[in-house]
Amino acid sequence: MDAALLLNVEGVKKTILHGGTGELPNFITGSRVIFHFRTMKCDEERTVIDDSRQVGQPMHIIIGNMFKLEVWEILLTSMRVHEVAEFWCDTIHTGVYPILSRSLRQMAQGKDPTEWHVHTCGLANMFAYHTLGYEDLDELQKEPQPLVFVIELLQVDAPSDYQRETWNLSNHEKMKAVPVLHGEGNRLFKLGRYEEASSKYQEAIICLRNLQTKEKPWEVQWLKLEKMINTLILNYCQCLLKKEEYYEVLEHTSDILRHHPGIVKAYYVRARAHAEVWNEAEAKADLQKVLELEPSMQKAVRRELRLLENRMAEKQEEERLRCRNMLSQGATQPPAEPPTEPPAQSSTEPPAEPPTAPSAELSAGPPAEPATEPPPSPGHSLQH
């Protein structure tokens, strides 16, 4: 029997490799479908691109949630539980697979599967970056081609049988969840529970990034979501500062400023991270930028500069002690054999002056303690 006719989908051919059990499941909106998959090229070697079994955990999607690779929902809803089938899908269905694959690989590496940390997600990501970070996926992106998916359907859960994660919510539910998550993150931050606070901010960011992929980049609604996202990312960075994860703060804040160079708080938070890793010049430059953009933050800037001066002085003292210890250890070593040649005449140049302490003229940005209050929930749904 021609399975392509049964699916009634152009550009799809199905071959059942192992029959399933029972009747066809009742796939309804909100059903969770759990499955293993293997993606291959249509070349002679049947080159494997991705394999969920190698990752060590199955994949799952929610029916009706506009999954990135829409054809997978069609394929899965044609299957019985425990069925194994091979699907050949033409290029019209596989063009966005490289973007999905990148998300899956990020997840396998323990990173956020929605890639919020690079401040763009899905198709919107392609407007800001020209590579997916994987050579084979870049090739697929440039030259889309038919792909083969081998899928094993493991389980189908009704909407009432499992607890839905925030990223599985509808568009309207996500928008309602964001201010709640934001406010909870702020509450936890004030209690000093920075790990839990950062998780709440991350959840809110994931919701907004998912919504943002459904908007045209740089148009009004996309920019509104971007502003909300940047606020949450900076709150998340304040948690990272408390957890002493300074280089990740530098990564996130620098990425924000590449796209939105007028965000004062991003300069302030980045300055604090630079100061913690003794990047004196960079910290002072960011604090100076804070003053240029927001002169009213002069008091906070001065405070940060004093802290920077103290930190640099402590570092210089540590270096002097280290050098002194090295010299004292060298003095206890047996004297070296005298050189056979007369030593060269010593230089009469005076020793270099020690660096002066940095001046105290800068420091700003909202203090890290009170995290930004959550924005009011927008009054309209972003469902598409």
Swiss-Prot record:
Residues 367-378 have a biased composition (Pro residues). TPR repeats lie at residues 178-211, 230-263, 264-297. GO terms for molecular function: farnesylated protein binding; peptidyl-prolyl cis-trans isomerase activity; unfolded protein binding. Keywords: Cytoplasm, Disease variant, Leber congenital amaurosis, Nucleus, Repeat, Sensory transduction, TPR repeat, Vision. It holds the Pfam family PPIase_AIP. It is found in: Cytoplasm; Nucleus. Changing residue 239 to R: In LCA4; no significant effect on interaction with NUB1. Transmembrane segments: none annotated. GO terms for biological process: apoptotic process; negative regulation of apoptotic process; phototransduction, visible light; protein farnesylation; regulation of opsin-mediated signaling pathway; retina homeostasis; visual perception. InterPro entries: AIP/AIPL1/TTC9 (IPR039663), PPIase_AIP (IPR056277), PPIase_dom_sf (IPR046357), TPR-like_helical_dom_sf (IPR011990), TPR_rpt (IPR019734). The keyword Zinc does not apply. Changing residue 96 to I: No interaction with NUB1. Residues 53-145 form the PPIase FKBP-type domain. Changing residue 262 to S: No interaction with NUB1. Residues 328-384 are annotated as: Disordered. Its main location: cytoplasm. Highly expressed in retina. Specifically localized to the developing photoreceptor layer and within the photoreceptors of the adult retina. May be important in protein trafficking and/or protein folding and stabilization. It is linked to Leber congenital amaurosis 4: A severe dystrophy of the retina, typically becoming evident in the first years of life. Visual function is usually poor and often accompanied by nystagmus, sluggish or near-absent pupillary responses, photophobia, high hyperopia and keratoconus. Interacts with NUB1. This is Aryl-hydrocarbon-interacting protein-like 1. The lineage of its organism: Eukaryota, Metazoa, Chordata, Craniata, Vertebrata.
